[in-house]
A protein has these predicted regions:
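Alpha-helical segment of the N-proximal tetratricopeptide repeat
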Residues: 13-45
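TPR-adjacent "capping" and linker segments in tetratricopeptide-repeat scaffold/adaptor proteins
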Residues: 2-18
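Residue-level recognition of tetratricopeptide repeat
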Residues: 24, 58-59, 93
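Structural signature of tandem alpha-helical TPR/SEL1-like repeats
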Residues: 2, 28-41, 64-76, 97-101
Length: 101
């Protein structure tokens, strides 16, 4: 396999990297239902996959305005990586939105 243009921090397989890339492209094209289904399918195969959890948090929070779900996924990231600043900041943002009536 060719050298990746980034560090594969989570040691994802080539298949996982491809699936993640495809799901992210779906999200960029605003094919949100397909992106959600793809991310959830990846999560079934690898329940603790940080990149998938982060993407689901982003999808639910920013794209679908389902703030409670976004918070749930960012909390799952923080259970594994308590120092993950991105997940902590996003969780804080969406928790504020959850408190608005």
């Amino acid at each position: 396999m060719a050298e990746l243009p980034f560090k594969n921090t989570y040691d994802l397989s080539p298949e996982q990297l491809l699936a993640l890339d495809e799901a992210e492209e779906m999200m960029e094209r605003l094919d949100l239902g397909a992106a959600e289904a793809a991310f959830l399918a990846m999560l079934e195969e690898a329940p603790g996959c940080i990149p998938v959890l982060n993407n689901l948090g982003h999808l639910y929070g920013k794209m679908l305005s389902e703030f409670e779900k976004a918070v749930e996924y960012y909390e799952k990231v923080l259970q594994q990586e308590p120092d993950n600043a991105w997940a902590r900041d996003q969780r804080r943002r969406y928790l504020r939105y959850c408190s608005y009536d």
